[in-house]
Amino acid sequence: MTNDSVPAKVMEIVAKQLEKDQKEVTPESSFANDLGADSLDTVELVMALEEEFGTEIPDEEAEKITTVQAAVDYIQNKMDDGKIKLEK
């Protein structure tokens, strides 16, 4: 997986976790306001991202990830820092 493929993968994970059609999920989508996620949904979503990308997202960082784009940015920044290495 490359840095460029992260947005599509994040949107796929969000759609699956929140049981939404992928067409409903955009980079600007807010998990709570646009996609109807509650706090438990958000925790499960962060866990799914951690599992997919092989990283740990600290709680203080997870609280800042409220949109699809915020999740993409977080993952891409970790990749740029060399903290996530993807071979998929």
UniProtKB/Swiss-Prot annotation:
<dbReference type="InterPro" id="IPR006162">
    <property type="entry name" value="Ppantetheine_attach_site"/>
</dbReference>
<dbReference type="GO" id="GO:0000035">
    <property type="term" value="F:acyl binding"/>
</dbReference>
<keyword id="KW-0963">Cytoplasm</keyword>
<dbReference type="GO" id="GO:0000036">
    <property type="term" value="F:acyl carrier activity"/>
</dbReference>
<dbReference type="InterPro" id="IPR036736">
    <property type="entry name" value="ACP-like_sf"/>
</dbReference>
<keyword id="KW-0597">Phosphoprotein</keyword>
<feature type="domain" description="Carrier">
    <location>
        <begin position="4"/>
        <end position="79"/>
    </location>
</feature>
<dbReference type="InterPro" id="IPR003231">
    <property type="entry name" value="ACP"/>
</dbReference>
<keyword id="KW-0596">Phosphopantetheine</keyword>
<dbReference type="GO" id="GO:0005829">
    <property type="term" value="C:cytosol"/>
</dbReference>
<feature type="modified residue" description="O-(pantetheine 4'-phosphoryl)serine">
    <location>
        <position position="39"/>
    </location>
</feature>
<dbReference type="Pfam" id="PF00550">
    <property type="entry name" value="PP-binding"/>
</dbReference>
<dbReference type="GO" id="GO:0016020">
    <property type="term" value="C:membrane"/>
</dbReference>
<comment type="function">
    <text>Carrier of the growing fatty acid chain in fatty acid biosynthesis.</text>
</comment>
<dbReference type="GO" id="GO:0009245">
    <property type="term" value="P:lipid A biosynthetic process"/>
</dbReference>
<keyword id="KW-0444">Lipid biosynthesis</keyword>
<dbReference type="InterPro" id="IPR009081">
    <property type="entry name" value="PP-bd_ACP"/>
</dbReference>
<protein>
    <recommendedName>
        <fullName>Acyl carrier protein</fullName>
    </recommendedName>
</protein>
<keyword id="KW-0276">Fatty acid metabolism</keyword>
<comment type="pathway">
    <text>Lipid metabolism; fatty acid biosynthesis.</text>
</comment>
<comment type="similarity">
    <text>Belongs to the acyl carrier protein (ACP) family.</text>
</comment>
<keyword id="KW-0275">Fatty acid biosynthesis</keyword>
<keyword id="KW-0443">Lipid metabolism</keyword>
